[in-house]
């Protein structure tokens, strides 16, 4: 065997060494590989295929990664054939790499990963989204921390129509934000570390994030979920934008755009106007109350028993707002669901109801009138039963009397004792799985001076707002006090006051 190949396969060491020694070995190995690449550049360019076939990316991930980095920077690998070979090797690497080794060389891993989704075009967008999604989940299987790669990837996936491959990543709940100064005294290769301890700007597994980038990520996630008709996930994503904590009680433009979409998606999801969470800042609530008023009126009209009110409000916002904000199709979908929710809500009054009576008691917001025939009602109800939005069955009496809809109990109401117990156990297991995350978060927050200062300021601001509210009960507010904040550096931590 070529002695140079021996250098590439000298790491990782045999099992049995502790994390500190493993990390030190990784740094020494990276230095030797760097020297090998520098002194044997021509050999690597000419023999890259043979070298990478010999170096298993799942076992010798660090060496494989550093060879990939060299080839990406090499002017000799610019032909179409070379690009295809390089893309093949990169795909193998991102699907197989050893996450423990990669933690020891975060900057190189990030640089190579960026090439997978860059405009350089080594991969078609569909392949790039699938590969980068797999790589990020391989680095952090919990998917609990957002990175700069998440932000770039969701934009690529949405803009190129490759949302499906992204879902395994964006469906993961984000718990952590990466920040400078989060590194631990423990070696990065310690597999017991929580994600923020090894994924942060210091380890270079992510770049620094701004508040604008995080808001954009959640907003695009919401759009991706809308595209897939995943209403609960879309609603949650937009709500994260709406309730985003900003410095000095500000509110960004993207938050107001998210608020409008949040209202529309909320109507589709629950059939009624959503209520702002308590965590929404007072400043944001004031801005939403004015800039989002047309959408709020549209949502209130959704509760009307006649479709005419909803149609009129739709015409108002369609002429002024919907086209400019990209909400035309979403609002039209709300119109289409108006009658569906009227039918669903009949279960609050009836156990069963004839299709003729459904025709009389419900209206289409698309036409502003009841459906023209009982057959049309029959088709609508059957489609709702088929897609799972309506728990019911159409009964057709043998004596020829009119067909009727029987409402069935929801799956939760019809659970047996055994099924209910299994559901409780599942919830308890989920809570138990969160315990180490909560413990790690509490430890970090308890020792974070900026967080403590921020908490004290929030309490002070809340008390001040309450006092001002008592003093000016019934009064208005000054629109000039609005602060539209476009960007805030999250890496600098929360402001000290």
Swiss-Prot record:
Keyword Cell membrane: no
Superkingdom per UniProt: Eukaryota
UniProt keyword Cytoplasm present: yes
Single GO cellular component term: COP9 signalosome
Sorted UniProt keywords: Cytoplasm, Nucleus, Signalosome
Start and end residues of each PCI domain: 233-408
UniProt-annotated location(s): Cytoplasm; Nucleus
Pfam families reported in the protein's UniProt record: COP9_hel_rpt
GO biological process per UniProt: ubiquitin-dependent protein catabolic process
PROSITE patterns: PCI
InterPro entries assigned to the protein according to its UniProt record, in alphabetical order: COP9_N (IPR055089), CSN3 (IPR050756), PCI_dom (IPR000717)
Membership in a protein family: Belongs to the CSN3 family.
Function: Component of the COP9 signalosome (CSN) complex that acts as an regulator of the ubiquitin (Ubl) conjugation pathway by mediating the deneddylation of the cullin subunit of SCF-type E3 ubiquitin-protein ligase complexes. The CSN complex is involved in the regulation of the circadian clock through its control of the stability of the SCF(FWD1) complex.
Description of how the protein assembles with itself and partners: Component of the COP9 signalosome (CSN) complex.
The name this protein goes by in its record: COP9 signalosome complex subunit 3
Species of the source: Neurospora crassa (strain ATCC 24698 / 74-OR23-1A / CBS 708.71 / DSM 1257 / FGSC 987)
Protein encoded by which gene: csn-3
